[in-house]
UniProtKB/Swiss-Prot annotation:
It comes from Borrelia duttonii (strain Ly). Disulfide bonds: none annotated. One of its GO terms (cellular component) is large ribosomal subunit. The keyword RNA-binding applies. Part of the 50S ribosomal subunit. This is Large ribosomal subunit protein uL1. GO terms for biological process: regulation of translation; translation. It holds the Pfam family Ribosomal_L1. Binds directly to 23S rRNA. The L1 stalk is quite mobile in the ribosome, and is involved in E site tRNA release. Protein L1 is also a translational repressor protein, it controls the translation of the L11 operon by binding to its mRNA. The gene is rplA. GO terms for molecular function: rRNA binding; structural constituent of ribosome; tRNA binding. Belongs to the universal ribosomal protein uL1 family.
Length: 224
């Protein structure tokens, strides 16, 4: 839904669209022009210079968590299933859980599977793929290290990826958070993003960076 309305336009008028702000000033500005009562999410939008064959995707744990704990579903059997339960997975199973999802169960946020389960889990591709939840080695969600994976997910491990237009949208905090903590989350995200520069890319990797709140206008960042 397009952002509009009197309060939005008032907030927009306080943003100099001809200026690129340093990240600290941008965060302060977003807090200053906030006009809604709920606790908005602070988002970063990065436009990358990528070729069609380039993939930019990574997982990370931000230093300061702000999202609710994810409901973890694990496909595993035997001892691995017991391990998943022991370390706090919300749902654990094999064929029974596969059938439950086929029947419409969707009360989970992330899916992990042991490698031996993937032949059967693959049948859920049309369902899990649509939600971006299909286990994948690139996101470390196909693994036998259930203890480590569940622990990192509970700490808030999350993923960023560039879409087909070379844009990454990533959340780094809430408007109620201390500005320093938002900045540190932003720095961690940018650090990990820059590590994913394609090795064969010539020229600029990051074209532009903007930050915004859920309902507020975007602010361009002076990114060098």
């Amino acid at each position: 839904m397009a952002k509009s309305g009197k309060k939005y336009l008032q907030a927009l008028s306080k943003v100099n669209k001809l200026k690129s702000y340093n990240i600290d000033d941008a965060i302060s500005l977003l807090k200053e022009i906030k006009f809604v009562k709920f606790d908005e999410t602070i988002d970063v939008s990065v436009n990358l210079n990528l070729k069609k064959n380039h993939t930019v995707r990574e997982t990370l744990v931000l230093p300061h968590q702000f999202m609710k704990e994810k409901r973890i579903l694990v496909f595993a059997k035997g001892e691995k299933a017991e391990e998943a339960r022991e370390f706090g997975a919300a749902y654990v199973g094999d064929d029974d859980l596969i059938n439950k999802i086929k029947d419409g169960f969707s009360d989970f946020d992330v899916v992990v599977a042991t490698p031996d389960m993937m032949k059967d889990v693959g049948k859920l591709g049309p369902i899990l793929g649509k939600r971006g939840l299909m286990p994948n080695p690139k996101t470390q969600t196909i693994t036998n290290d259930l203890k480590g994976t569940i622990a990192s997910l509970k700490k808030g491990r999350t993923e960023f990826r560039a879409n087909k237009n070379g844009v990454i949208n990533f959340s780094v905090g809430k408007s109620s958070m201390d500005s320093k903590k938002i900045r540190e989350n932003y720095d961690e995200f940018i650090k990990e993003l820059l590590k994913r520069r394609p090795s064969d890319l010539k020229g600029t990797f990051v074209d532009s960076v903007y930050v915004s709140s859920t309902m507020g206008p975007s602010v361009k960042i002076d990114f060098v």
